[in-house]
């Protein structure tokens, strides 16, 4: 991990990568979905907790279920995308810590602490969702993350037992570059950073 990636790779992951809202008809295959997860799973989470859970919504039936909870401004985006990922978290993630972090007991620090469980799960599943976006870009896909949906309705539809809870949605596929908006600016270093 000692070398800097070449500029074309950095462009693909960050500098030239765009958030897509329109998509080509090229499908996202099972092999691609597996490759995507097999990349993102290696990225760091607190105590290797890996609370993120991912539901890859592709079928017309599953899309129809999902669209019931999507904000009106996002409906067409989800319809057009070959795959929409529900980035969720497992409220019982800590039960797997003996397997995921065998070096010492991390599970007991969460037992009986629902606020800590929720805070840790939300933060780290959001991290894993960001890793999903980078993994998608690394594999030549595009991504379009969204937070405009009814969490309660979605969770009732897809996670009725209450164990998993939704964090955000992310369309993935092969974006239609001709339908991109002009690139929006970003904050300058001086506006967003402090060095102490």
Curated annotation (Swiss-Prot):
Keywords of the record: Flavoprotein, FMN, NAD, NADP, Oxidoreductase
The keyword DNA-binding is annotated on this UniProt entry: no
Class of the enzyme per the UniProt entry, highest EC level: oxidoreductase
Family annotation (InterPro entries): Nitroreductase, Nitroreductase-like, Nitroreductase_HadB/RutE, RutE-like
EC nos: 1.-.-.-
Cofactor: FMN
Pfam family, one: Nitroreductase
GO-annotated molecular function: oxidoreductase activity
PANTHER family given in the database record: MALONIC SEMIALDEHYDE REDUCTASE RUTE-RELATED
Family: Belongs to the nitroreductase family. HadB/RutE subfamily.
Name of the molecule in the record: Putative NADH dehydrogenase/NAD(P)H nitroreductase Rpal_4764
The species this protein was found in: Rhodopseudomonas palustris (strain TIE-1)
